[in-house]
Structures are given as structure tokens and as C-alpha cells.
């Protein structure tokens, strides 16, 4: 059984121990998965692309018709307080200057069970901060293995919803195969992975699926575009079919915790061609270097 750490968390206006945090069994997040979440990385205690995460939080809340319960400044203050408490406590043997993840969850709130959205309900707001689980040097050097699956999830992947059963089932497919991620296709076209966006490289250009209701617009969507422009790599969002992925020169993942991570094996077959077959490629390497620079310049 996992031990819940005795770290500071925020719940409905109060700070307290994560071990003691409780919500009502009638909370609609518990009953229906009726809520949204955000995961904001922090490097050396500084929040990375904070405003972009807040903008996506606003978009998700608007799609669920939930009013944002806090201002940007209030969110920033709470995030920084949780980070400072974690660093001070030295949770999980962390030291000052290490990296953290702030998890934010907002549900519609507590109401009698009914599928119809209730009026005049106060949202439940929960926040916690954890040490970031870093990608290992070996994973960066050798890349990771992924498997593929049909995208069997619901039609609103654009909402960062707490209703994640489809993603859980998808991620378990790769876990059962000892792989890092499950890359999914809907009607033969790439959507995303269970907990990552997916990018392919063809003839030196980075390609990704277009923004749609089937794909969560990861914060790294815009970041990858910016980094490609910075280092002179072509970038294009267009439909990417299954054959494009398996024929790609490179494949890589992006997410808050993976940052950019090369995929070197797909369904047991090496990714890429020639001398770089089954190895991280040069486009990934350039983007990783640019990402490292961005972590310094785009954190507050």
C-alpha cells in the first residue's frame, strides 16, 4: 500500500496536510468526473509557462460552464506557497533547486446526484505539489518504446477533464507491454498518446495532428512551434496517418513531465532509417537543447 506523503496541500481556501485532505462523497468530481485539472511544472521552484497553463485551465472551465474561482495572481500565490513548502520540507529527499509539479483540480462541487449541471454550486478546488519524476539519462540517450492502439476514448479530448478512465485503460496497454506510452489512432489517423502529445519527423520537418476535439492541446503544442522556429526546423500541423508514423524518420513525445522524449521503438519495431534506426534523431536533439534553454527563460 502506498504511503500518502505529509506534504502541504490546498483545499477550498485552506492549507493543510495532504494526508488529512477530504472531500464529500457527493462531490461531482467523485460521482461523475465532472471537473478539470492542470499540471504545471516548476524548475528550481519557478513555474514554467504559467500563463499558458492558466489560459488552458480557463478554456477547460469554460467548456464545462464552471466559473474560474481564482484570479491569476491568486493561483500564482498558491502555487508558489506549495512549492516553497515542499522545498522547505525536503519531501522525498528533494533539495532546494530541484524540480516540482503543481497539480490543480477544480470540480463543479457538491450536489445531490443528478446528471443535469446544478446551479449555484461552489466549485471544489484542490492543489498539491510533488517532486517531478524526471526522465532518466538512459531514456534520453536510448529513447523509449511505445505501443499503438485504437483511440477508444470519448470525443472531447480537448477538455483536460478529470474523467480519465479512457486514458487509464490506454496507458495500461503500454504498461502491460513494458512500454513507456500508448500512441493512439482514430480512423487511421494519429491523435495523441495516453498522457502525451505525439510528433513525427519527416524529411527534417516536425509534423503533428491538427488541433481538434479529439486532441488535448498540450502546452507544448505552441512551445514546440516556437522551438522549431528558434532553431530553424519546419513545423506543420496536418492529418498524420498510421503509415506516416511508422515510416517517420523520428518520433517523439511531449508533456509537462516528459518535456520532449524520443521514441525509438514502436510496436517492437525500430523507429527511423539507416544509421539512426532505433536511435534518438538530430531533430529531437536540437529541440531538447532548445527546451532546456526555454526552461530558464520562460519560468517565473
Please provide the spans of the model-predicted regions.
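Conserved alpha/beta cores of soluble small-molecule-handling proteins
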Residues: 1-182, 187-189, 221, 226-300
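Glycine- and Gly-Pro-enriched alpha-helical subdomains that act as flexible
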Residues: 187-211, 217
Amino acid at each position: 500500500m502506498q504511503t500518502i506523503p505529509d506534504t502541504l496541500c490546498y483545499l477550498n481556501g485552506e492549507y493543510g496536510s495532504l494526508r488529512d485532505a477530504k472531500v464529500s462523497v457527493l462531490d461531482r468530481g467523485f460521482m461523475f468526473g465532472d471537473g478539470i485539472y492542470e499540471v504545471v511544472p516548476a524548475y528550481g521552484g519557478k513555474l514554467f509557462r504559467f500563463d499558458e497553463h492558466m489560459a488552458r485551465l480557463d478554456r477547460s472551465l469554460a467548456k464545462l460552464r464552471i466559473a474560474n474561482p481564482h484570479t491569476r495572481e491568486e493561483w500564482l500565490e498558491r502555487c508558489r506557497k506549495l512549492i516553497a513548502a515542499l522545498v522547505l520540507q525536503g519531501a522525498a529527499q528533494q533539495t532546494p533547486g530541484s524540480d516540482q509539479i503543481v497539480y490543480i483540480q477544480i470540480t463543479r462541487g457538491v450536489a445531490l446526484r443528478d446528471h443535469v449541471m446544478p446551479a449555484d454550486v461552489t466549485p471544489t478546488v484542490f492543489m498539491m505539489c510533488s517532486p517531478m519524476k524526471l526522465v532518466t539519462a538512459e531514456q534520453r540517450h536510448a529513447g523509449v518504446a511505445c505501443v499503438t492502439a485504437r483511440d477508444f476514448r470519448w470525443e472531447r479530448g480537448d477538455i483536460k477533464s478529470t474523467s480519465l478512465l479512457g486514458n487509464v485503460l490506454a496507458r495500461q496497454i503500454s504498461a502491460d507491454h513494458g512500454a513507456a506510452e500508448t500512441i493512439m489512432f482514430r480512423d487511421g489517423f494519429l491523435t495523441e498518446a495516453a498522457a502525451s502529445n505525439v510528433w513525427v519527423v519527416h524529411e527534417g520537418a516536425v509534423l503533428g495532428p491538427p488541433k481538434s476535439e479529439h486532441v488535448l492541446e498540450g502546452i507544448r503544442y505552441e512551445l514546440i512551434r516556437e522551438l522549431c522556429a528558434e532553431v530553424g526546423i519546419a513545423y506543420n500541423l496536418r492529418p498524420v496517418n498510421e503509415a506516416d508514423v511508422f515510416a517517420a524518420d523520428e518520433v517523439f513525445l511531449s508533456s509537462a513531465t516528459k518535456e520532449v522524449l524520443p521514441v525509438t521503438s514502436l510496436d517492437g519495431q525500430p523507429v527511423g532509417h539507416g544509421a539512426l534506426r532505433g536511435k534518438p534523431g538530430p531533430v529531437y536533439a536540437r529541440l531538447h537543447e532548445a527546451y532546456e534553454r526555454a526552461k530558464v527563460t520562460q519560468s517565473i
